[in-house]
Amino acid sequence: MSRIEALPTHIKAQVLAEALPWLKQLHGKVVVVKYGGNAMTDDTLRRAFAADMAFLRNCGIHPVVVHGGGPQITAMLRRLGIEGDFKGGFRVTTPEVLDVARMVLFGQVGRELVNLINAHGPYAVGITGEDAQLFTAVRRSVTVDGVATDIGLVGDVDQVNTAAMLDLVAAGRIPVVSTLAPDADGVVHNINADTAAAAVAEALGAEKLLMLTDIDGLYTRWPDRDSLVSEIDTGTLAQLLPTLELGMVPKVEACLRAVIGGVPSAHIIDGRVTHCVLVELFTDAGTGTKVVRG
């Protein structure tokens, strides 16, 4: 018997009753989820995440999943004997590296998640920006020691084909998005998944953006455990941005972009918690940091 099955019936009923206001608020709304970290590699967490997506779909909520795959790309490059290079925290993406990224993101990571979700019903569809030009890229550079530096086939989201994406949602599908997209000349670029998730959430008019991480939420004075915040506004967060740990910066920038762009709230949540999405969306306590306009 599982721990959930062992709970008294009245406790189960109380949990469901607590979820009702949130279910009503989110019914018919789009929720964009950036999937990554431990939730993408631990088998129990992967299966729980897939079940969460199916749960949302069956509650009349429209999840859209945007996933990364940096560690998996690195592992495949090593297996193939291809040297990887990083500049300014970004992977230098040569045509050879891009071929590996496409294979891993769409052919491995995306496929695995699609299959896990579809174990619950015919819901998930794996896509990239190349499909029906769902989104396009514009090449980007990074600043290293004050100098603009080329990092190859790495882009930012330029435009999102909102109508095509919403067609999938309206058909009851769960888009599972691998962040590869062509530029204006048809040259495919790899896009940071945090950046892409924010752009998709903004374009679709999502009700929420959820960013799965491997920490409890946002710490304003890391590693001070007492500095974890449950809610923060965009003005305060923007001022805090230069002081944050490097790994948190893309996630915080994504939250800022989404909320300033019209998404009512963005959430940095602990992907190490089983069913973290349901905990954040449907309980009063939540499991991370909520970012709101302010």
UniProtKB/Swiss-Prot annotation:
Main localization of the protein described in the UniProt heading: cytoplasm
Cystine connections: none
Keywords: Amino-acid biosynthesis, Arginine biosynthesis, ATP-binding, Cytoplasm, Kinase, Nucleotide-binding, Transferase
EC number: 2.7.2.8
Annotated site residues (Transition state stabilizer) in this chain: K34, K251
A GO CC annotation given for this chain: cytoplasm
InterPro entries for the chain: AceGlu_kinase-like_sf (IPR036393), AcgluKinase_fam (IPR004662), ArgB (IPR037528), Asp/Glu/Uridylate_kinase (IPR001048), Glu/AcGlu_kinase (IPR001057), NAGK-C (IPR041727)
Pathway assigned in UniProt: Amino-acid biosynthesis; L-arginine biosynthesis; N(2)-acetyl-L-ornithine from L-glutamate: step 2/4
Places the protein is found: Cytoplasm
UniProt GO BP: arginine biosynthetic process via ornithine; L-arginine biosynthetic process
Residue sites binding substrate per the record: G69, G70, R91, N190
Catalyzed reaction equations: N-acetyl-L-glutamate + ATP = N-acetyl-L-glutamyl 5-phosphate + ADP
A molecular function (GO) term: acetylglutamate kinase activity
Family from the record: Belongs to the acetylglutamate kinase family. ArgB subfamily.
Role, per record: Catalyzes the ATP-dependent phosphorylation of N-acetyl-L-glutamate.
Name the record gives this protein: Acetylglutamate kinase
Origin species: Mycobacterium tuberculosis (strain CDC 1551 / Oshkosh)
